[in-house]
Amino acid sequence: MENTRVFVSGLPPTFTNDQLRMHFSSRFQITDAHVLPKRRIGFVGFKSSEAAQQAASYFNKTYVKMSKISVEIAKPIDSEPVKKAEKHRKGSTSNDSTAGKALKRKRDGDNTQKDPQLQEYLSVIERPSKTKTWANGDDFLNTIQNQPATSELREEQRDDTSEKVEEHSHKQRKKPRVDDVPKAAHDREPEPMVLDKTEEEHERANADGQVEAIPPTQEEAEPVSDADWLRSKTSRLLGLLDEDEQAEFDSTAQRKPDPSSEPETVSKAGAQHSDDDKAAVESSVEEEEVDTNIEHIRLSSRLFVRNLPYDASESDLEPVFSKFGKIEEIHVAFDTRSTTSKGFAYVQYIEPDAAVQAYKELDGKHFQGRLMHILPATAKKTYKIDEHELSKLPLKKQKQIKRKLEASSSTFSWNSLYMNTDAVMSSVAERLGVSKADLLDPTSADAAVKQAHAETHVIQETKAYFTANGVNLDAFKQRERGNTAILVKNFSYGVKVDDLRKLFEPYGQITRLLMPPSGTIAIVEFARPDEAQKAFKGLAYRKVGDSILFLEKAPANLFDATTAPQTSVLETKAVSQGFSTADTFAAEDGDEPVVTSTLFVKNLNFSTTNERFTEVFKPLDGFVSARIKTKPDPKRPGKTLSMGFGFVDFRTKAQAQAALAAMDGYKLDQHELVVRASNKAMDAAEERRREDTAKKIAARRTKIIIKNLPFQATKKDVRSLFGAYGQLRSVRVPKKFDRSARGFGFADFVSAREAENAMDALKNTHLLGRRLVLEFANEEAVDPEQEIEQIEKKVGEQLDRVKLQKLTGTGRKKFTVGAQEDEEA
């Protein structure tokens, strides 16, 4: 997908979003503007990639408030430089957090409350008024007697002489000094004194990050001997035990681990793996979110698309999302009070895989200058029919309910200009001033032909009215349907425009309401697609007057862009569809599209595309095609460059001359066009050959094949129906062996113009309830050389059959099965 955003750097420090929007919208139409003031950068979105390229080249290295800005096309989020910058930013952040956590752990390690010697010292110097006089002073020594000694202390003990030990012991007994405790503590790292086994287990649980508490156990304090008390006051083991007791004490110390080292080990391991665990957790959470979104999308096949431009419509979103699969519905949310888009939409796919693929490919991508954010949407609410309750209703009522519920999704098989037969005959009878009984004489054999003529007259009048009001009749040939206009059909004759307006206005704002003077069909256009959808669901198959209302979605691009909407019915005269001999010959003398006139257009902008070039010349009368001359781009293989000129083809020379006068000097993409007549060198013989070929083709288009012909129709009915539009050479209706019609026929006119008039007039007409399907029949070859080739081919096939017959035998021979076996026996 092409990028539609530009990156702006070097902005003034106090630049705002509104100022950035005003600066770029002075020359281009923008959809988004965002400024990061601390970094002095910003992003601007445009409707198309061409506009973004032009803005980048125009505003690059310009000045804004004495600041030189740099403008370039923004890089996608998934590009390689952006990924590297993101990775570097995450790495620096994790390093900072690791350093901070290390310092925090180091500070947390200085926990003075776990030092028993310091606690004992604080208890000694505490005021007597704050101490508990009834408490035992040697409570700190209850569990110290089981504390093991380290190997270093045992070796030092063996090296000391008994005299030093006795002397040291004598001094300690004589005068125990509290000040010696911190001095001895400098020889080794302070070890926390465990007051109870329960507290030891609790400290281990806290170090492992567990929350489960262990219930404390109460044990009675045992009396402490003098040797144990002295051992607790010294940092070195004194030789107060016998050799056997010392060996037993050493083995106990080796078996029992040091609990103080376990929290430190756990903290170091946690410090090493904290960042890796955090990154792994973040990545796993993102993967889980993506997997969850995909699961939800597979269930609903529906996407929620946000951060869209406020002027985006369903037609803009459809080419973007239809690449991944068939779309059932696109709904853009509108504010009912302000009649503006809310900036988000829902896309409903038919297949879940298509929705998942669109989610993966388009999430975070550019669309008209904005980054789309796609999320899974809940399934659309559907109103299902209760089959049990429906079965209790009459069969006719069941069909009506089902048909109304399926109206919005079903397609119709009849033609778009279908009209109620009764309404057509009522309209014609009123104009002629006669009753329908007189118009349709039951004793007449050609009542069906009269009805077909009346319908044809009304259809031609309706076409003339729609053309005068900006309706593109060629749009009825296409299958693509729009989402704002509705064709209203099959209502009774006598329904007025005001009646239809009152019927449709409660569903939304009507921008256009067209009803021909015949009053047999109407076109209603709404301002928003959701309003048209509501009206379609609410009014489909509703009874209006004496008939049921038929609604059909109008074709896409039904109205010309140059025609302003009209909500009133114009009073137009009924146009007669009869063709006189003078009209026929006048038409024959008119300009035929035999030679196509071409205009040469130069001084084009090199950025102008073929679509833009065609869009400018297409509204002109007689336009056929437009193209810009290009050449291969040597720097970009596979791409093309504009050569700055092009050609425009028209049907006739007069139309080309009128276009030259209108478009010469026209300004297109800041370039003034120079339009001249194209002088293509052509051989006189080649030009004469083209004219002869065109005349031959025009002469051949005189025979019409009539398909879907009713089986009750006769040759007389076909001649009566088609004879009103020209002189017929012959009429043929093929029949079966039982003399019944085969469902098609042929009508051969004298001139091609008469055949075309009959084709245009009767291609939407119904005969005995069947719509006639008309096509030009393929004539037999007129060129003598082609006739000779066909004869030679036929003779060759006959010769091949004769040769094959000679090889296989000319006749049947009689032979006896098993005769040879009897002879051998």
From Swiss-Prot:
MF terms in GO: mRNA binding; rRNA primary transcript binding
Residues annotated as domain RRM: 4-76, 301-379, 484-556, 597-680, 702-779
Transmembrane feature ranges: none
Keyword terms, alphabetized: Nucleus, Repeat, Ribonucleoprotein, RNA-binding, rRNA processing
Domain of life: Eukaryota
Region listing for Disordered, in residue ranges: 80-289
Annotated GO CC locations: 90S preribosome; cytoplasm; nucleolus; nucleus; ribonucleoprotein complex; small-subunit processome
GO terms classed as biological process: endonucleolytic cleavage in 5'-ETS of tricistronic rRNA transcript (SSU-rRNA, 5.8S rRNA, LSU-rRNA); endonucleolytic cleavage in ITS1 to separate SSU-rRNA from 5.8S rRNA and LSU-rRNA from tricistronic rRNA transcript (SSU-rRNA, 5.8S rRNA, LSU-rRNA); endonucleolytic cleavage to generate mature 5'-end of SSU-rRNA from (SSU-rRNA, 5.8S rRNA, LSU-rRNA); small-subunit processome assembly
Principal location: nucleus
Ranges of biased composition (kind: Basic and acidic residues): 152-169, 177-206
Location of the protein in the cell: Nucleus
Gene3D superfamilies, A to Z: 3.30.70.330
InterPro entries, sorted: Euk_RNA-bind_prot, Mrd1_RRM3, Nucleotide-bd_a/b_plait_sf, RBD_domain_sf, RRM_dom, RRM_dom_euk
Role played: Involved in pre-rRNA processing.
Family, as annotated: Belongs to the RRM MRD1 family.
Annotated protein name in UniProt: Multiple RNA-binding domain-containing protein 1
Lineage: Eukaryota, Fungi, Dikarya, Ascomycota, Pezizomycotina
Gene transcribed to yield this protein: mrd1
